[in-house]
């Protein structure tokens, strides 16, 4: 009797787990389709992949850092999560009730998560992966000394006054400065460069 009860509990658990998986996760992404439904399915699956990679890199970063830096990384990561959720919700609400609202939210989630993934890798290697410094140097041209600061500001775009982003960026750039001597002001501009274009 106990074995039969355990069997039914197991079956019920499997069905419960299957019902909790979103419908789009069970459907195949069709990259050739531009219907909203397919864009949402593909966007969700892309976000899930990038988010899984980010979680893996976060764990690796925690292992590679000294105890004091681990505490700051945890704090910065929490600030980043609050920023990402608030920022992408704002983008969603800006389009809602339009059919593109979920697509805009997923695009924001993918872009901000991918940018954070690059930051976590950079914290482990000391090498920013966003191409910011290379692009700024190329834009500066021959007169690198004079043109570098100007090209960095142009690449970073307009000031971004979101308080959640500022808390996240300040914490991250403070950490990057301590670990790799990245200039705080340049780091802030570099992080603005990573923000989605529709900010």
Over which residues does each language-model region extend?
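Bacterial N-terminal signal peptides that target proteins for export
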Residues: 2-12
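N-terminal signal peptide c-region/cleavage motif recognized by signal peptidases
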Residues: 20-22
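N-terminal alpha-helical modules
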Residues: 24-199
